[in-house]
Amino acid sequence: SDNPNIDEDEPEVLYTALTHSREPLGMMNLIYFVQLLAEEQNSNTELEYLISNREMWFIPIVNPDGYAYNELIEPNGGGMHRKNRLNTNCGNGSNRGVDLNRNYGFGWGSNDTGSSPNPCSATYRGDTEFSEPETQAVRDFIINHEFKNVLHYHCYSNVYIHPWGNGSFPEEPDSSTLVDIGREMARYNGYPVGTGLSTIGYTVNGDAVDWTYGDQSIISYVPEVGSTSQGFWPPESDVLELCLDQVHSNKIFAFVAGSDIIIHSYELSHEDMVPGETVELDVVIQNRGLSDSDAYIDININTLNEF
């Protein structure tokens, strides 16, 4: 926002990362994007527009205790602790804790495939839904705002995942809306778009995306950033490129929080014209955003031939 201390009547969008504490690239990507917004807002018209017309919120670390533990055991990176640090009577290592992305209240504990009742499992869902302070904090933050869409970053697999966690698709028109947004996010990096089952081959329950969409009716996505070979802790030399890969998707996700008017398609009655001849032009305008548009639309048509 260009007025961060004022609650303006602008579309709101939220980005989160590091729900799983061994997935730091989500955080790095968000910090890079925030830096880009701050440093290039006066030289980049898209960024300037977003700052002036959106309220963008960032939670770069959802799981600070888990991340601090990874820093403790592997100061140079590479710690593989995934969950938070709740004492679940599984020792002091990486088996303890609750998987925060199985602790949300929508579909929590619906089966033992998408999450686990075993306190020492990597996908342990907790004793009850929203049992953990981290998920409570994210829940309350979302409820206290009017977000149009939320992006929950994870690693890895180079895919964009939308609801539902059980592999089924939302009803229309939301299903098409989600796919259209995901495909535009993937325009330049080519990430596959779909459910977790269709993209990475497994189901989840009690996850943040299903709660955000299913309980709060907010369009939500999980970007899984980084390739299988790069893993949870990609080489330092790969980090900048991976952050750059998400700039377009981060911008698009902010654009679609409001009205986002584009030329969807156009058709000429015929393309070859002799001097003085007229043609008919049919233009289809689409609002691919999540908010209504009350603006006038101007279309300027210019010739590419100076003669």
Put a short name on every predicted segment.
Residues 71-72, 76-266:
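Metallocarboxypeptidase
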Residues 284-307:
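Short acidic, flexible loop segments centered on an aromatic residue
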Residues 1-88, 138:
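Active-site-adjacent structural elements in enzyme catalytic domains
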Residues 271-277:
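Short, solvent-exposed loop/linker segments at the N-terminal edge
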Residues 265-269, 282-284:
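Short structured motifs
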Residues 4-7, 92, 111, 275, ...:
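Short glycine/serine/proline-enriched coil/turn segments at secondary-structure junctions
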Residues 14, 222, 280-284, 296-298:
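Beta-strand secondary-structure signal
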